From Swiss-Prot:
Domain Kazal-like: 6-56
Keyword tags: Disulfide bond, Glycoprotein, Protease inhibitor, Repeat, Secreted, Serine protease inhibitor
Origin species: Perdix perdix (Gray partridge)
Residues carrying covalently attached carbohydrate according to the record: N45
CDD domains: KAZAL_FS
Xref: Pfam families: Kazal_1 (PF00050)
Protein location: Secreted
Protein name, as recorded: Ovomucoid
Amino acid sequence: LAAVSVDCSEYPKPACTMEYRPLCGSDNKTYGNKCDFCNAVVESNGTLTLNHFGKC
């Protein structure tokens, strides 16, 4: 099973759109979209990873 990943190299961003495309993080939290998730990844110093696309 290949690990699912998201390219967060363009982040953090100061503001995210309201677009709803949920992702489930390794913290079992559902993030509203890639921007929200990637900002959290940056804040976690890379410890947060993607569990899967869609709600947790």
